[in-house]
Amino acid sequence: MHSRFQAALTTLAADLQAAIAPMLADPHFPALLEADQVATLQQATGLDEDALAFALLPLAAACARADLSHFNVGAIARGVSGRWYFGGNMEFLGATMQQTVHAEQSAISHAWLRGETSLRAITVNYTPCGHCRQFMNELNSGLALRIHLPGREAHALEHYLPDAFGPKDLEIKTLLMDAQDHGFPVSGDALTQAAIQAANRCHAPYSHSPSGVALELKDGTIFSGSYAENAAFNPTLPPLQGALNLLSLNGYDYPAIQRAILAEKADAALIQWDATVATLKALGCQNIERVLLG
């Protein structure tokens, strides 16, 4: 079991502890629960889905990397597939606050990059900030997404984001988590291919500046992240953050990164290169390459 879960596990009810401990045994537990694992936990505890998600929030919050604020926020995104995806806020010392990943973004990006096609609900241990409410409005589940907060009645996103501005106002039809393929030829070694594939499935309807990042770890594991734009621009999630989020959720630390590749267009309206390099160097990675999409 990864050390980050040890203290959080002791806060759970005894029956839930006993049921989930075997699932957490792998130090690289992927911070997600398959539908059958959710059913197993429900059977062991007698909890319905909503109550179980609340009970598991301490484990999601344990995934946070709040190196600046030391304020851990946890989120659990529930996919239409039945899978549950953990998320936690991420802050990067030596970078800028603009590189921060919020817990809701973490859980949603986690689900998206794992192939989930839509979300039913998200459970969070603190009220979503305006940034996250706007980020969620980019999803194909839209304002119908159910938000679950401790001690409050569940509401759809539209309750928390009235008179919302979103993709429809800009006549965007393809939404975040919809299937997308930008069709760039995939070639090169495994890491280069992963970066191009990540760019191919990114969501960039506003700038038309597709990009993807792939990170290779010392043990050969590869994590990739896709760019996720937002109608309000600022809540956009860069591709590096998507990859770093997966890396962290899977129990790895930044020093494990031995090589990184960014895939983007040379003539794109928005360029990720400088911000990607600056953040990776702040995390100790010096071997950074760029492949141009053709």
From Swiss-Prot:
Gene3D superfamilies: Cytidine Deaminase, domain 2. Its EC number is 3.5.4.5. The active site is at E104. GO terms for biological process: cytidine deamination. PROSITE patterns: CYT_DCMP_DEAMINASES_1, CYT_DCMP_DEAMINASES_2. Binds 1 zinc ion. Its cofactor is Zn(2+). The keyword Metal-binding applies. One of its GO terms (cellular component) is cytosol. SUPFAM superfamilies: Cytidine deaminase-like. Pfam families: dCMP_cyt_deam_1, dCMP_cyt_deam_2. One of its GO terms (molecular function) is identical protein binding. HAMAP family: Cyt_deam (MF_01558). Belongs to the cytidine and deoxycytidylate deaminase family. This is Cytidine deaminase. It comes from Klebsiella pneumoniae (strain 342).
